[in-house]
């Protein structure tokens, strides 16, 4: 096996570094002389920023710390490669660098846009008769990648969201006062993360009263009527909402607070924020309730201290599966997770066509959403509950979790 190049792209997760560990250890086991890391993704490679991971991952303790370190160890980017037919320069530059470092396989850990990068690199490689293998490794807390049962990163984010919301529910019940709490959860176009709030429910907690997802347009009057009903029934009403919920006119609720915000290279609004504040103000003004808005923000994507062991394990497995696929000669593929059963929960990895993943989004199935569009049902529970099981204990130093950094 020739040398290997691996990068991380897009938003970080609590387990993206476990996938990096899977790529690194499997590549070394398969005989790769060097495993190079892209510093700051494909953008960093274009600037010649590579690191030999053998120099920074010296022993088993480093690997164990890597699995427990949140965010992207190598750094990330949101750089969109152009169509090579329009601008071939970056491709010429990249393939010259691949030749210089004797790269035989490139692995990119990321979401939809990262799979677009793998798709373009593999297609260009074919046109220039390159033997380099290009494989995608799935990563996103949004859980919106096609052709995989679920995406590494989601289980840990879901576990964090359910746990924190459960604690918010406890906190909201402290005083003998009626109130409505609105918790804003990430999710630009899909509601997988907000739906995870339902996992707070159990024998000691009822979970959130309402969950609003981008999959259903927001009906203001129906929403207010339901909140009014709930407010009469109980002291504290808890609402979970995706940041990307839109009204019937297709306008983000957060844009009704502010229209400010830049777009990233892929045409996405860089920051969605304000949905919970909009709803809290709406309820306060229209219903006269005491309200509070909470944004989980970036905390939900990097809480490695509360990571799902299932998620950590599967993240490592898809990294290893990607390398094994490259060794077999596969390219233009993504390592995916296939669910075999729920009881007991069992999965296996498989390789899927990356072109069928890039630039597509998987939404929460309509049949998993309640008829009124303001909650999820037991079908979601059966799907998501296995993904948050078990814990990976942090390695502590001075009373706080220890991490590893470049």
Region annotations inferred by a language model:
Residues 1-50:
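N-terminal phosphate-binding or glycine-rich loops at protein starts, especially the Walker A/P-loop
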Residues 3-11, 72-78, 104-110, 136, ...:
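Short glycine-rich or small-residue beta-strand-to-loop segments that form or flank ligand, phosphate
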Residues 9-11, 38-44, 78-79, 111-112, ...:
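Short, ordered loop/turn segments at secondary-structure junctions
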Residues 13-23, 45-46, 89-92, 112-120, ...:
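Short glycine/serine/threonine-rich phosphate/pyrophosphate-binding segments
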Residues 35, 97, 105-110, 116-128, ...:
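Accessory alpha-helical/coil subdomains and C-terminal extensions
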Residues 48-104, 113, 152-154, 166:
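Glycine-rich oxoanion-binding loops at beta->alpha junctions
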Residues 252-406:
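C-terminal non-catalytic interaction/assembly regions of soluble proteins
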């Amino acid at each position: 096996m020739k040398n290997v190049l691996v990068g991380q792209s897009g938003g970080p997760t609590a387990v993206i570094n476990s996938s990096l560990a899977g790529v690194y250890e499997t590549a070394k086991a398969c005989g790769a002389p060097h495993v190079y890391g892209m510093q700051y993704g494909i953008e960093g490679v274009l600037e010649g920023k590579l690191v030999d991971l053998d120099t920074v991952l010296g022993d088993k303790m480093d690997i164990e710390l890597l699995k427990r370190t949140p965010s992207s160890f190598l750094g990330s980017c949101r750089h969109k490669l152009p169509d090579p037919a329009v601008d071939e320069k970056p491709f010429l530059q990249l393939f010259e660098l691949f030749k210089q470092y004797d790269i035989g396989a490139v692995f990119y850990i990321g979401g939809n846009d990262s799979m677009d990068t793998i798709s373009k690199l593999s297609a260009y490689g074919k046109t220039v008769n390159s033997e380099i293998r290009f494989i995608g490794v799935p990563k996103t807390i949004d859980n919106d990648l096609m052709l995989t049962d679920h995406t590494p990163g989601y289980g840990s984010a879901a576990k964090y969201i359910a746990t924190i919301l459960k604690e918010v529910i406890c906190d909201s019940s402290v005083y003998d006062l009626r109130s409505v709490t609105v918790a804003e959860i990430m999710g630009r176009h899909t509601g997988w993360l907000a739906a995870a709030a339902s996992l707070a429910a159990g024998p000691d907690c009822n979970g959130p009263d309402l969950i609003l997802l981008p999959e259903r347009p927001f009906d203001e009057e129906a929403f207010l009527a339901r909140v009014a009903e709930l407010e009469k029934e109980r002291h504290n009403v808890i609402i979970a909402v995706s940041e990307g919920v839109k009204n019937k006119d297709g306008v983000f609720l957060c844009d009704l607070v502010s229209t400010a915000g830049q777009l990233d290279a892929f045409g996405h609004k860089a920051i969605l924020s304000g949905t919970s504040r909009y709803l809290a103000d709406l309820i306060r003004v229209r219903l006269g309730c005491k309200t509070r808005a909470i944004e989980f923000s970036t905390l939900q994507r990097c809480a490695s201290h509360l990571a799902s062991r299932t998620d950590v394990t599967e993240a490592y497995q898809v990294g290893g599966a990607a390398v094994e696929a490259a060794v077999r000669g596969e390219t233009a593929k993504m390592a995916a997770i296939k669910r075999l059963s729920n009881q007991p929960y069992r999965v296996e990895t498989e390789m899927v066509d990356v072109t069928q993943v890039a630039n597509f989004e998987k939404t929460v199935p309509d049949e998993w959403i309640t008829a009124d569009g303001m909650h999820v049902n037991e079908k979601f529970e059966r799907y998501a509950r296995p993904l948050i099981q078990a814990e990976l204990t942090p390695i502590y130093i001075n009373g706080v979790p220890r991490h590893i950094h470049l």
